[in-house]
Regions:
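Small beta-barrel nucleic-acid-binding modules, primarily SNase/OB-fold domains
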Residues: 2-145
Length: 145
């Protein structure tokens, strides 16, 4: 039992140390805009996708009703709120970036930090995104959730 408690305490301390990463350790970028709640473009035209989260997507096509075959109204308000929240967080600020990998679309997958706070984690905590279980292993903060 004592070994188990020591292991749990060690794990929690390690996560706390990784979770509160200081933006002083990472290079800084500035963003010119955000496409949605998890993808932005830097002033150097680098497309960055926030690691470990999934935000609402833009609905481009109306779904058809099976009975009448007419387009039904679709709602992009969740998409817009998520994108607006991310824009409010990163616009006009120098943002620390920890590049992780490149995705199949050529975007940089990265964690972003503002004032020692993880931007992806802020999107999740505010309800504008969810943790992507498939990619949660890339971020220490997402593993504990």
């Amino acid at each position: 039992m004592v070994k188990f408690l020591v292991l749990v305490i060690f794990t929690l301390l390690a996560q706390a140390r990784l979770g509160g990463a200081s933006d002083q350790r990472f290079p800084f970028v500035r963003f010119q805009g955000c496409y949605d709640g998890d993808t932005c473009t830097t002033t150097d035209s680098e497309k960055v996708r926030l690691a470990c989260i999934d935000a609402p997507e833009l609905t481009k096509r109306p779904r058809l009703r099976a009975t009448r075959m007419r387009p039904i109204a679709y709602d992009n308000s969740l998409f817009e709120r998520s994108a607006d929240h991310l824009r409010a967080l990163v616009s006009g600020r120098m943002v620390g970036i920890r590049r992780i990998t490149t995705d199949r679309h050529g975007r940089t997958v990265a964690e972003l930090f503002i004032d020692d706070k993880n931007v992806g984690q802020q999107q999740v905590m505010s309800g504008h995104a969810v943790i992507s279980r498939k990619y949660a292993w890339q971020c220490a903060w997402a593993l504990g959730s």
